[in-house]
Amino acid sequence: RQLHINRFVPYGRAKTFENKLNMEQFYKWVDRGYDFLRNIYINYYKQNKEFIFNIDVSNDLCNQVYSKGRKTSCGVNCNQISIDSNGNVYLCPSLHIEEFELGNIRTDNITEIMEKSKQKYGEIDVEMLSKCKNCEIKYYCGGGCRAIAFNETGDLYGQERNCDNYRNRVFDLMLQ
């Protein structure tokens, strides 16, 4: 069994509607869905049932709480790339922005593209994110979504606006 739900990342045309969204209502909706899915995951976990469970909408909180040691929240510049229909390679599916274009698989060697990316961006982990360095849950959280941080701050290494709410969610899960 497998469940995968993508996160809401306001970028591109969706960014123009971001200010029109009632974020309080949006997060209440996300929380209701998150609570429902969290209960499913906890039940599977307690029963030792195998279940591939990726909840990007809540940044995969359940898996993170039960697997300490994460230095990244995803595979950005580590084991993930995104390729568009023209062969352009990007750091992340949510960062299809010219600034983050790494090369093109039609004209460039994929190994060289990855090496160039590592040289340009280094390892993007909680140890290099200034707001995360002293955070008590950094190895559960992994530093949050780099695409959301970039879209909110203009900085790939910035902090998501929702960081404090996220930290509280992790603590709530730990107490269950």
Located regions from the model:
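Radical SAM enzyme [4Fe-4S]-AdoMet core and its adjacent flexible, acidic
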Residues: 1-80, 84-86, 94-105
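Flexible mid-to-C-terminal extensions adjoining Fe-S/redox cofactors in radical SAM and related proteins
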Residues: 88, 94-176
